[in-house]
Every structure is written in C-alpha cells, then in structure tokens.
C-alpha cells in the first residue's frame, strides 16, 4: 500500500495513529483514553535521574541518526513498529514531520524518542535505550525543549508504568480532541 504523507498528517491531526498488528498489517488506531506527558509542573521524574542529569553524561541531538532511532524503537521481542511503518517514518522525516530526539554518549546512540510534530502537538510514537538512562534523559530534555518552543501537547498515546514515572495522565477522547485542536492552532516548530 502507498501511504500519502499529507493524508497521514491529516489523520494524526484528527487524533489517529498508525500501528502494525501481530501479523504486521498496518492500520489506523485511536483510543477512548489518551495518555499525555505533562508540559507543566505536573511533569516529574525519579530523583535518581536528577543525579544522572547533573553528571551530564549524555548530549542531546535532534535527527542526528533518525533511522537508528526508528530501528532502536522497533528492536524488541514484541513490536508494533513494522518495516513498513519504519519506511513511513523515514518518509515523514524527509518531509519534516517526524523527528528523533536523541541522547548520545560520545559517538554512541544512548537512547531516543521517535515522534511526529504538527504545530504545537508532539505525538510520541516510541522510545528506546541502548545505554541505561538514555531514554529517560531524552524524555526530560524533550519536555524541556517542547516547553521552550511553546508546545501545547505531548501525546504519548497509551499509558504504561514507565511513562507514569514522568507524571503521565489520561484524558478522554473528547478532551484530547479539544486540546489537539488548540495545539494545532499554535505555530510551534520542533527545530
């Protein structure tokens, strides 16, 4: 199937997201309960992570190695990121919609977050790490970056225990669409 970039972005702007099922078939999904990462003072992280941040062991980059972040996010026993979806992410990256927010330790990719930025909305697709704390530092630094750029929404799509450590919270689909509309009316740029 050929996926048109404009149609993909329009669907994300309406609250849908792409996922592959267990057979690798790509489809559009939505959720009645959406998970957000707070961009206000509700954002938090473990105190042990503050020590890591203070040590400045990681540097941060955007799109330094976008393909590696895609493959890092997909490289797990059970994944919803198929080869076809990686090709779509690469296409969206080339068009200026998909981004990787990365942490590095020297020349080694430590971790990263893959997402789609549409005006004031950042839709986080996945995250991974190669070095312990790499993705956690990426999360903290991404939130700082989104705040500095005036983003309204950091959509994490689905809740999990890891995201809960950062203060993630759920909202109804109706609330989500109202917030998404507000985010889409903002003129923000990730880079």
Swiss-Prot record:
Cellular location(s): Cytoplasm
Establish whether keyword Cytoplasm is in the entry: yes
| A GO molecular-function annotation | leucyl-tRNA--protein transferase activity
Which keywords describe this protein according to UniProt?
Acyltransferase, Cytoplasm, Transferase
Question: What EC numbers are recorded for this enzyme?
Answer: 2.3.2.6
Q: Name one GO cellular component term.
A: cytoplasm
Specify where it is mainly localized: cytoplasm
**What's its catalytic activity?**
N-terminal L-lysyl-[protein] + L-leucyl-tRNA(Leu) = N-terminal L-leucyl-L-lysyl-[protein] + tRNA(Leu) + H(+); N-terminal L-arginyl-[protein] + L-leucyl-tRNA(Leu) = N-terminal L-leucyl-L-arginyl-[protein] + tRNA(Leu) + H(+); L-phenylalanyl-tRNA(Phe) + an N-terminal L-alpha-aminoacyl-[protein] = an N-terminal L-phenylalanyl-L-alpha-aminoacyl-[protein] + tRNA(Phe)
Top-rank taxon of the source lineage equals Bacteria
The enzyme class is: transferase
* Biological process according to GO: protein catabolic process
Record-linked Gene3D superfamilies? Leucyl/phenylalanyl-tRNA-protein transferase, C-terminal domain (3.40.630.70)
Among InterPro entries, the record links this protein to: Acyl_CoA_acyltransferase, Leu/Phe-tRNA_Trfase, Leu/Phe-tRNA_Trfase_C
Enumerate the PANTHER family for this protein. Answer: LEUCYL/PHENYLALANYL-TRNA--PROTEIN TRANSFERASE (PTHR30098), LEUCYL_PHENYLALANYL-TRNA--PROTEIN TRANSFERASE (PTHR30098:SF2)
Stated family = Belongs to the L/F-transferase family.
Protein's job: Functions in the N-end rule pathway of protein degradation where it conjugates Leu, Phe and, less efficiently, Met from aminoacyl-tRNAs to the N-termini of proteins containing an N-terminal arginine or lysine.
- What is this protein's name? Leucyl/phenylalanyl-tRNA--protein transferase
Q: Which gene encodes it?
A: aat
């Amino acid at each position: 199937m050929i996926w048109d970039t404009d149609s993909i972005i329009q669907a994300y702007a309406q609250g849908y997201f792409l996922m592959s099922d267990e057979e690798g078939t790509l489809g559009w999904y939505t959720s009645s309960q959406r998970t957000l990462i707070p961009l206000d003072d509700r954002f938090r992280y473990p105190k042990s992570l503050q020590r890591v941040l203070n040590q400045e062991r990681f540097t941060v980059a955007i799109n330094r190695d976008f393909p590696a972040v895609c493959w890092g996010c997909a490289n797990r026993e059970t994944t919803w990121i198929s080869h076809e979806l990686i090709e779509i992410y690469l296409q969206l990256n080339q068009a200026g919609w998909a981004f990787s927010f990365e942490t590095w330790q020297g020349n080694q990719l430590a971790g990263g977050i893959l997402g789609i930025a549409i005006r004031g909305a950042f839709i986080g697709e996945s995250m991974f790490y190669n070095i312990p704390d790499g993705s956690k530092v990426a999360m903290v630094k991404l939130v700082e970056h989104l705040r500095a750029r005036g983003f309204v929404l950091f959509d994490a799509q689905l809740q999990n225990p890891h995201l809960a450590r950062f203060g993630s919270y759920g909202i109804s689909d109706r609330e989500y669409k109202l917030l998404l509309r507000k985010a889409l009316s903002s003129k923000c740029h990730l880079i």
